[in-house]
Swiss-Prot record:
The lineage of its organism: Eukaryota, Metazoa, Chordata, Craniata, Vertebrata. Keywords: Cell membrane, Cell projection, Cytoplasm, Membrane, Microtubule, Neurogenesis. One of its GO terms (molecular function) is sodium channel regulator activity. This is Fibroblast growth factor 13. SMART domains: FGF. PROSITE patterns: HBGF_FGF. Microtubule-binding protein which directly binds tubulin and is involved in both polymerization and stabilization of microtubules. Through its action on microtubules, may participate in the refinement of axons by negatively regulating axonal and leading processes branching. Plays a crucial role in neuron polarization and migration. Regulates voltage-gated sodium channel transport and function. Required for proper head development, it is involved in neural differentiation through regulation of the mek5-erk5 pathway. It is found in: Cell projection, Filopodium; Cell projection, Growth cone; Cell projection, Dendrite; Cell membrane, Sarcolemma. It comes from Xenopus laevis. The keyword Cell membrane applies. One of its GO terms (biological process) is neuron migration.
Length: 245
């Protein structure tokens, strides 16, 4: 019995060794086939990596979008606010002018940037209350949007106000359609009141905020033209110094 088991084990071992030799001979005799299989495996791996990478690129997160409006701003004084190609800010009786169309871009809670659609310039107010235009979005381009009575809206500087009283400085037009100094415009006067006339809803990229110290400034605090910024004080024209009417 024991001898039969032993001979059976020896036979099984011999058969196993023969199978191993046979497999080794096959591998040696057909190296090109093995190489081909290896190449196929490599291609499969690379294709999977490439496919994974392409899927990853397609899944890029979209840039943040802000929902604003393209609108006209009708002053209670009887003019449409307009921003002319030379940077002049004033009022126009003609409603059809493309210079009277603005992008109102939300940049905070009840805070907007006012940008001319035609010129791509931002409205801004400096530390002396003067309105000017800028190619770049800075803290001086931020205006607080407040709803007044009868659906009129006021726009006041977010960073400048009267030092002692704390009274806000407002965007305003006088009876002649001239832009006024912000510290001469009062909230309860028609000069400060604008009625938005929305044309359509639009999606905007969030403007890149530039620091004011990046730009050269004159002694009066009025932005001046430089290589990095175009700041124009009402297109070089005079502004109304009278109190709001």
């Amino acid at each position: 019995m024991a001898a039969a088991i032993a001979s059976s084990l020896i036979r099984q071992k011999r058969q196993a060794r023969e199978r191993e030799k046979s497999n080794a001979c096959k591998c040696v005799s057909s190296p090109s086939k093995s190489k081909g299989n290896c190449e196929k495996n490599k291609l499969n791996v690379f294709s999977r990596v490439k496919l994974f990478g392409s899927k990853k690129r397609r899944r890029r997160r979209p840039e943040p979008q802000l929902k604003g409006i393209v609108t006209k701003l009708y002053s209670r004084q009887g003019y449409h606010l307009q921003l002319q190609p030379d940077g002049t800010i004033d009022g126009a009786k003609e409603e059809e002018s493309s210079a009277t169309v603005f992008n109102l871009i939300p940049v905070g809670l009840r805070v907007v940037a006012i940008q001319g659609v035609q010129t791509k310039l931002y409205l801004a107010m400096n530390s002396e209350g003067y309105l000017y235009t800028s190619e770049h979005f800075t803290p001086e381009c931020k205006f607080k949007e407040s709803v007044f009575e009868n659906y009129y809206v006021t726009y006041s500087s977010m960073i400048y106000r009267q030092q002692h009283s704390g009274r806000s400085w407002f965007l305003g037009l006088n009876k002649e359609g001239e832009i006024m100094k912000g510290n001469h415009v009062k909230k309860n006067k028609p000069a400060a009141h604008f009625l938005p006339k929305p044309l359509k809803v639009a999606m905007y990229k969030e403007p890149s905020l530039h620091d004011l110290t990046e730009f050269s400034r004159s002694g009066s605090g009025t932005p001046t033209k430089s290589r990095s910024v175009s700041g124009v004080l009402n297109g070089g024209k005079s502004m109304s110094q009278n109190d709001s009417t």
